[in-house]
A protein has these predicted regions:
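Catalytic-core signal marking the mid-to-C-terminal active-site face
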Residues: 138-205
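Phosphate-binding chemistry for phosphorylated carbohydrates and sugar-nucleotides
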Residues: 1-138, 142, 151
Length: 205
């Protein structure tokens, strides 16, 4: 159908043609929400995670996300005095870790959001309510606030593999790790759960 969270480009086209300010796309089961702005485009989930965690700034300041989150997320949260705990990819892992760590928020770059204060699972609709609260709080300056947050440039490559059993990811990571010694860089190598590829993410300023 070419719609929903995986087709945010179509939503963006519609709101620009009709001169709407914002648009929201869900996935099939509603645990994921993507937010777009007519001028800015698709709003990065990592930036919303920062702003959501600021709204939820009560007691524990731990935020859970996955290892493939943009390096900018960690930098932004550190600047706020919050702690980022990174897990393997998977919404269930994020939720379980958030519960264990008593985190104020769990989220993935894909647009999955878990709010422990009012839900026991990922919920895109709750994210929408908090998004509206952000719009009300920042009024006409919301996009300027979004622009002010750090977000590193990213190169992403999928490397086809034939025999996954022959790949020692720990050894590969250990060999590459010494090459990435700049605090303004981040390299993640992981095996896809669905496709016969290695996914490589490199963030840099």
């Amino acid at each position: 159908l070419k719609c929903g969270a995986l087709e945010s480009g179509r939503l963006l086209k519609i709101i620009r043609e009709n001169k709407f300010d914002y648009g929201i796309a869900f996935d099939g089961d509603g645990d994921r929400a993507i937010f777009v702005n007519r001028v800015y485009g698709v709003i990065e989930a990592e930036k919303l995670i920062v702003l959501f965690s600021k709204l939820l700034n009560q007691g524990n300041k731990t935020v859970i996300s996955t290892e493939i989150c943009n390096k900018g997320l960690e930098e932004n949260l550190n600047n706020m005095g919050h702690k980022l705990f990174q897990t393997e990819v998977g919404d269930r892992i994020v939720v379980e870790t958030a519960i264990e760590e008593k985190a104020i928020l769990g989220a993935e770059p894909s647009g999955h959001y878990y709010f422990p204060n009012c839900s026991n699972t990922m919920d895109g609709l709750i994210a929408v309510f908090y998004f509206f609260e952000l719009l009300e709080k920042h009024n006409n300056n919301f996009i300027e606030v979004i622009k002010s947050l750090n977000h590193f440039k990213r190169i992403k490559k999928d490397i086809p593999i034939e025999n996954t059993q022959e790949i020692n990811l720990d050894s590969l990571r250990n060999n590459i790790k010494p090459m990435i010694n700049n605090p303004n860089e981040k390299l993640i190598i992981r095996q896809s759960m669905w496709d016969p590829v290695l996914r490589v993410y490199y963030d840099y300023k």
